[in-house]
Amino acid sequence: MINKLIEKIQKTGAPIVVGLDPMMKFVPDHIRKAAFEEKGETLEGAAEAIWLYNKGIIDKTYDLIPAVKPQIAMYEQFGIPGLMAFKKTVDYCKEKDLVVIGDIKRGDIGSTSAAYAVAHLGKVQVGSSLCAGFDEDFVTVNPYLGSDGVQPFIDVCKEEKKGIFILVKTSNPSSGEFQDRLLSTGVTAGTDAENVGGIAFSDKPLYEIVGEKVAEWSGQFMGDKGYSYIGAVVGATYPEQGKILRKVMPKSFILVPGYGAQGGTGKDLIHFFDDNRLGAIVNSSRGIIAAYQNEKYSKFGARNYADASRQAVIDMITDIDQAFQTIGK
């Protein structure tokens, strides 16, 4: 699947992913009204509204982009009907030949981690049949529990030729509370360095140590185009850390959240990529799906919300392209 993602990026010239993170406050009144008239002001009505909203955006942008990234929590809040809308969205995007990155951020161990992996990437045994669950192409994974949590996902990826993006340096403001903590390397934590003869050691931030582990994992499952099926999540809001991690994880594709509404711009992104404009894919969610609520795109109005989303995609592609041109890439 990493091969397909790269091919789609090359075909579209757009190293971007649209985050399908619907909130009811983003859904135009006419869509909410139609959904509620059919199914009432219920969880079913809300799920129908976000599905119709998503479909409109997909229909207007699928020819411009390689991938989408639905955030499952935005669907889970509407219970089982919301999860059905999530699945419907995944399936529709795949019909449009888009790569689907399920933003699920799962993290557990053993059989539980394996069950998460099967639910979203693999197939479950049901009697004599093998049945796919949500069936995304990639998912995001939380590595806090270590290899016990990540390896089951890698195993399913190998079986299904799918991939994962592991959280390394996230875009949120408080990420540094843990991810930037300095840890001693080269000696066991707590050891008196003066008593360790001839061993060099230094302090590294936790995100860099996680990045080194991702680089190790990535070697287990390489694609045909120089990149692994095992990628990383690194926020656009931390470009200097991104520059470091690009070197630490040379074979891992980087999923880059934080563009647009969170403050990231095209010029913040250039060091996430290799010299061929590959190696990263940049996410924008509400900056695209709720573009019509932005003054810049207000001329489109709520009725033409999806046209506003299309224009926001075009503007994002242009912004990133101009950033590349400034450094001759």
Question: In which residue ranges do the predicted regions lie?
Answer:
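Conserved, mostly hydrophobic/aromatic
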Residues: 18, 68, 103, 139, ...
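Conserved anion-binding
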Residues: 108-230
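A C-terminal functional module that forms or caps the active site or interfaces directly
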Residues: 236-283, 287-294
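N-terminal glycine-rich anion-binding loop in soluble enzyme alpha/beta folds
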Residues: 1-60, 300
